[in-house]
Amino acid sequence: MAKRDYYEVLGVNRNATEAEVKKAFRRLAMKYHPDRNPGDKDAEVKFKEAREAYEVLCDSRKRASYDQFGHAGVEQTFGGAGAGGFGFGDLGDIFGDIFGDIFGGARGGQAREQRGADLAYELVLSLEEAVHGLSRTIKVPTWINCKTCNGSGAKGSSPATCPRCNGSGQMRMQHGFLQVQQTCSVCRGRGQVIKDPCTDCHGQGRQQQTKTLSVKIPPGIDTGDRIRLAGEGEAGLFGAPPGDLYVQVRVKPHPLFHREGNDLHSEVPMDFTTAALGGEMEIPTLDGSVRLTIPPETQGGKQFRLRGKGVKALRSGAVGDLICHIVVETPVKLSPEQKDYLKQFAELLKKDEKNHSPRTRNWFDSVKDFFTSK
């Protein structure tokens, strides 16, 4: 049976914060945990499903992979076993994890490294840039490791073990039947204290700076695609691992083309004499212009497909087409002489209207039949 969407399992939207994900899982865990539903197989399955969703959506790396590739992006995490790969854990362990994070704590009685936050950057591209690809230099305000203390927060000295929590970074507290962990108020979860803080970073181990990065944009990228730059997010506290930078692509509207998948579409205006008599037109494409032969009696709305003049697919390499939509233009601002010629032409058409304007004649016949049948 196909797995359900993790966001659907927890009942949250795709923009849910980590706190909202935790709250949703806590509600489901209280309802379906096997300790509260002994012998209930349905509750057991629902609990496993909720915990799997929680494990993915509360991990920024797993969540990013899931958002981009679906279940295939995280299947190795669970060894292909699906929800069945999880143990239940007792309620204290589960809520110790959740409450610990809410109050700034961590699991396992060990100090937690405070990994740097992930960053997002919107990159606006022209259609030509998105189709052909390029390298773009961007500037990102962020936190970097302090160069003076190399990220330790302690210039010329070493951090000492926190005397309050003995290096665990956590203090255990009892809340009714639950035993939860709370971040140590002295070391703030690090497990170490700095007696001589670095004056440049005030003991944080990092400083604010604008980084200049080169981003390689692959050909065929489109609005909504993301490029992940691993380790280019904010530096972690006290030398902890950095976060990632996600470059979100947005392609600007183009005056001539609009994109649908790997195909490009373009409206091509045409004067009515060329539409009636045929001819040749020069059609712009993203790779230069091409000559298009227009057959006589071309009607408005006719589509011409130029093979291979679309977009090269980002992953498969297949190339789309350019689809030209013909718009027959009615002449405006006619001179008296031009109007006279058109009137003479119209009189000539009326002599054999069924052959010259079959769609018009068929339409009038349909209208006549509609009213006479009532």
Swiss-Prot record:
GO molecular function: ATP binding; heat shock protein binding; unfolded protein binding; zinc ion binding
Start and end residues of each J domain: 5-70
Gene Ontology CC annotations of this record: cytoplasm
CXXCXGXG motif repeat start and end residues: 146-153, 162-169, 184-191, 198-205
Cofactor: how and how many bound: Binds 2 Zn(2+) ions per monomer.
Primary subcellular site in the record, as a coarse category: cytoplasm
Claim: Chaperone is one of the keywords in the record: yes
Known cofactor(s): Zn(2+)
Compartment(s) where it occurs, according to its Swiss-Prot or TrEMBL record: Cytoplasm
Keywords: Chaperone, Cytoplasm, DNA replication, Metal-binding, Repeat, Stress response, Zinc, Zinc-finger
Keyword Cytoplasm among UniProt keywords: yes
Listed InterPro entries: DnaJ, DnaJ_C, DnaJ_domain, DnaJ_domain_CS, HSP40/DnaJ_pept-bd, HSP_DnaJ_Cys-rich_dom, HSP_DnaJ_Cys-rich_dom_sf, J_dom_sf
Zinc finger map (CR-type): 133-210
Its job: Participates actively in the response to hyperosmotic and heat shock by preventing the aggregation of stress-denatured proteins and by disaggregating proteins, also in an autonomous, DnaK-independent fashion. Unfolded proteins bind initially to DnaJ; upon interaction with the DnaJ-bound protein, DnaK hydrolyzes its bound ATP, resulting in the formation of a stable complex. GrpE releases ADP from DnaK; ATP binding to DnaK triggers the release of the substrate protein, thus completing the reaction cycle.
Record text about domains: The J domain is necessary and sufficient to stimulate DnaK ATPase activity. Zinc center 1 plays an important role in the autonomous, DnaK-independent chaperone activity of DnaJ. Zinc center 2 is essential for interaction with DnaK and for DnaJ activity.
Subunit structure: Homodimer.
PANTHER family: CHAPERONE PROTEIN DNAJ, DNAJ HOMOLOG 1, MITOCHONDRIAL-RELATED
Protein name from the UniProt record: Chaperone protein DnaJ
Organismal lineage: Bacteria, Pseudomonadati, Pseudomonadota, Gammaproteobacteria, Legionellales
Gene symbol of the encoding locus: dnaJ
